[in-house]
Amino acid sequence: MSPSERSVRFMLDIRYEDEALLIVNKPPGILVHPTTKEDETTLSAQISRYYQRQGWQLNLHPVSRLDRQTSGLVVFAKLPEIQGQLIKQGMQKEYLALVTGVLPARHGIIDYPIARKPGSIIEREINPEGKPCKTEYWVVSRSDRLKEIQPDTVAPYMDAGDLPADTVSSLSRQTPLSLVRCRLYTGRTHQIRVHFASIGCPLWHDNLYGNIPGPPQRHGLHAYRIAFVHPWTHTTIEVASALPEDLNRAWQNASQ
């Protein structure tokens, strides 16, 4: 077995698959799609090798995308018509985010338009001339260094059962961060990162929008839940992925 095949076996985490769709849990630090500078280490390339080993030649069509340093669920269609149907009908996408500071409300909606920042091909900004963007959030847990969260009040204002079982149970009892569940109503580039930075609560380790110097780091964002109506069967498909170990560890370390 080649090193690339070993990496696929280690990294490829398939959460759902049928004749039309593939949903994979992406780790942080890798691109979803190839670029001119990076090809073999991308998620798409690893999935292609996975199918090639089984003697299948598939052209996957992305339905959702994630930044390199964002982990979580990515949806691929195995047929272009499935891709088109899912994009047209839309999907319910939710994220778990570690945001710095304490949000002013336990539940809120951030509804600011976003546009590309002049002079940058990557960075976005709040701009009244930008495209409409809407993010709804619920605080799952919050505290500061002086206040300890008791076990029975980790999520008093939402049903913790909405989250994967191993998410809330492994959280630290004391932290300067806020764990937030986010629902996107639009899907703009860097939407969650820009929206929380705009209200003074940038994501943990987000050096693009959080004024943190240095090279890009793993930021506190995980695509944890996706739900949609299957284009063929018309049944509801819902897939979830718990907060990964590295973000749980960051949450715990922040309180020490």
Regions found by a protein language model. Name each.
Residues 1-256:
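RNA pseudouridine synthases
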